[in-house]
């Protein structure tokens, strides 16, 4: 059994897409803190924030993080999970943290292309490109401080997964044939 792999980064960096592909490539389970939370409270993130505020959402997010953390699991986290110091320390201590790093332009393009974009509550109330820039400026140092590895997430998902696997200690990789899975 291996430590969980936590994917952190801003909205649109590919945590869920890369996470599912990485789980398949490593034979790990996959979990998404936002999806777990939404399925357990039967509300969208926007509804939770509207009813409980960001503080209530962040408390629930910590509970979700702890609930999905298990050996041999790839965990896609919410973009703001690193705002809570406990979460940063927990992920860094319990698992391997991978920051999926991408520039504002890439993040905005991906977010604009997402069909569920309207389900995500605005963080600042500003236009998307301005919001993404501000949020990334506020959080980038926290992502970097928390991460064991920083990976360029602008590439194709398969290439990002290959780079993550190459960066991980050999004991995390399972080689089957000529493909890391």
Swiss-Prot record:
Pathway: Metabolic intermediate biosynthesis; chorismate biosynthesis; chorismate from D-erythrose 4-phosphate and phosphoenolpyruvate: step 5/7. Residues 112-126 are annotated as: LID domain. GO terms for cellular component: cytosol. Substrate binds at residues 34, 58, 79, 139. It holds the Pfam family SKI. Its EC number is 2.7.1.71. It is found in: Cytoplasm. It catalyses: shikimate + ATP = 3-phosphoshikimate + ADP + H(+). GO terms for molecular function: ATP binding; magnesium ion binding; shikimate kinase activity. Transmembrane segments: none annotated. It comes from the Bacteria. Its main location: cytoplasm. Its cofactor is Mg(2+). Gene3D superfamilies: P-loop containing nucleotide triphosphate hydrolases. Binds 1 Mg(2+) ion per subunit. The keyword Chloroplast does not apply. ATP binds at residues 12-17, 120. Catalyzes the specific phosphorylation of the 3-hydroxyl group of shikimic acid using ATP as a cosubstrate. Belongs to the shikimate kinase family. AroL subfamily. NCBIfam families: PRK03731.1. HAMAP family: Shikimate_kinase, Shikimate_kinase_2. This is Shikimate kinase 2. It comes from Salmonella typhimurium (strain LT2 / SGSC1412 / ATCC 700720). The gene is aroL.
């Amino acid at each position: 059994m291996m430590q969980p792999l936590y994917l952190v980064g801003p909205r649109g960096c590919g945590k869920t897409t890369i996470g599912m592909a990485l789980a398949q490539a490593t034979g790990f389970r996959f979990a998404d803190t936002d999806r777990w939370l939404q399925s357990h409270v039967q509300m969208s993130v926007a509804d939770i924030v509207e009813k409980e505020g960001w503080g209530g959402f962040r408390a629930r997010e910590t509970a979700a993080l702890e609930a999905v953390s298990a050996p041999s699991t790839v965990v896609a986290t919410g973009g703001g999970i690193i705002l809570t110091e406990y979460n940063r320390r927990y992920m860094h201590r319990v698992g391997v943290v991978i920051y999926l790093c991408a520039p504002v332009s890439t993040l905005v393009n991906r977010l604009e292309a997402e069909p569920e974009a309207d389900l995500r509550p605005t963080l600042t109330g500003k236009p998307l490109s301005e919001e993404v820039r501000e949020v990334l400026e506020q959080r980038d140092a926290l992502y970097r401080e928390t991460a064991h590895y920083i990976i360029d997430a602008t590439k194709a998902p398969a290439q990002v997964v290959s780079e993550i696997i190459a960066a991980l200690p050999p004991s995390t990789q399972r080689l089957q044939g000529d493909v890391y899975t």
